[in-house]
């Protein structure tokens, strides 16, 4: 709307025409005027936000289709190679005025694959690796539990040549980049709203992944989570999501304890005489997640009954029964918290049981 009429050459050439309205459209990243204008806008941003240490400079969200097909862009190579070239040019323009500011771009969907040749990144560029890998198993479980071989997807890559952790290491090797961060999705209801009422607890998987991120060289992790209406998680989601979100936050702050230790400490503070039983309940949920081998990647959860099978539901019911047997020993906030967690499980169980199975009927129980 702002530039296309006067400068169509700034936008992606797709199927022989400049088209900023094609799905997943991109700019023409080889265009020097696009580079100049981008640098000017970032310069203005840093001047208006002097305490900001970093700005995001990534391709538009989307897949492969909208990347420019002009001769200059095609000469640069793959989408990943195009974006490395573009971000390096912007970093060079800004370096003199802003030597300590970083430009971050996502290794994500069309830029998942590493460059095919050595392409060193400017020292002020940060790679953010978006965790396109299994949601139920750690990134170092080998190799990423085979998700890149066993499944084909209708979004992002149709297949993955390298599992996530190996792919990230390859990126670092080919770009000599030492500024690393990670984007992880903690929004289980984003793709399927039914998960807004179903627990998803990662347990020690969460802190194990954080150790892998740290060994990769990550300076920080960004957890894409709620409360956010777009993710179907709101302020009211905290009682259901706290074992997921709290462990992620605590593990970034203190990398020594495991998730089990973090949850154990929290349960002692929250649930009084039911602390150990509540911990067993959360660890049961985490174990069910870890035993799930259904198709799940990034923020796309498996179908509820694929994780919460009848056998898994029975295990959680036994853990819940052990908690109920202790309610007579509780009072005040401790009792209210326990009753809240038990009610959330009963609601989740009803949702799972009534969710359509693959044959169109409710899940079998």
Give the ranges of each region predicted by the language model:
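Charged, low-complexity, helix-prone segments enriched in Lys/Glu/Asp/Gln
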Residues: 83, 245-247, 266, 278-285, ...
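Aromatic- and carboxylate-lined catalytic core of secreted/periplasmic carbohydrate-active enzymes
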Residues: 230-303, 317
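Amphipathic alpha-helices that form helix-helix packing interfaces
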Residues: 278-281, 285-288, 292, 312-315, ...
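Catalytic-core regions of glycoside hydrolase
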Residues: 1-36, 40-260, 307-313, 317-321, ...
């Amino acid at each position: 709307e702002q530039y296309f009429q006067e400068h169509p050459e700034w936008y992606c050439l797709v199927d022989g025409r400049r088209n900023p309205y094609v799905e997943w459209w991109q700019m023409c990243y080889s265009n020097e005027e696009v580079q100049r204008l981008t640098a000017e806008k970032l310069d203005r941003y840093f001047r208006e936000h002097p305490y900001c240490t970093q700005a995001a400079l990534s391709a538009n969200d989307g897949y492969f289709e909208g990347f420019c097909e002009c001769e200059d862009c095609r000469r640069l190579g793959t989408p990943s190679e195009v974006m490395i070239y573009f971000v390096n040019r912007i970093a060079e323009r800004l370096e003199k005025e802003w030597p300590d500011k970083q430009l971050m771009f996502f290794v994500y969907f069309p830029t998942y694959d590493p460059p095919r040749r050595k392409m060193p990144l400017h020292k002020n560029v940060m790679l953010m690796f978006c965790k396109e890998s299994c949601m139920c198993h750690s990134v170092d479980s080998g190799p990423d539990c085979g998700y890149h071989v066993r499944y084909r997807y209708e979004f992002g890559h149709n297949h993955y040549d390298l599992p996530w952790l190996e792919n990230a290491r390859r990126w670092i090797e080919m770009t000599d980049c030492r500024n690393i961060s990670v984007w992880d999705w903690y929004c289980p209801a984003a793709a399927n709203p039914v998960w807004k009422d179903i627990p998803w607890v990662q347990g020690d998987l969460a802190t194990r992944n954080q150790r892998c991120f740290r060994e990769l060289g990550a300076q920080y992790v960004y957890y894409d989570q709620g409360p956010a209406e777009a993710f179907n998680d709101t302020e009211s989601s905290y009682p259901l999501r706290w074992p997921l979100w709290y462990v992620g936050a605590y593990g970034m702050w203190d990398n020594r304890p495991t998730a089990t230790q973090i949850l154990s400490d929290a349960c002692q503070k929250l649930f009084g005489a039911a602390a150990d039983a509540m911990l067993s309940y959360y660890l049961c949920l985490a174990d069910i997640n870890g035993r799930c081998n259904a198709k799940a990647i990034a923020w796309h959860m498996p179908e509820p009954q694929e994780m919460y099978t009848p056998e898994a539901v029975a295990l959680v019911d036994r853990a819940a029964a052990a908690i109920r047997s202790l309610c007579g020993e509780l009072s005040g906030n401790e009792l209210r918290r326990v009753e809240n967690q038990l009610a959330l499980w009963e609601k989740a169980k009803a949702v799972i049981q009534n969710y359509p199975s693959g044959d169109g009927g409710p899940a079998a129980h």
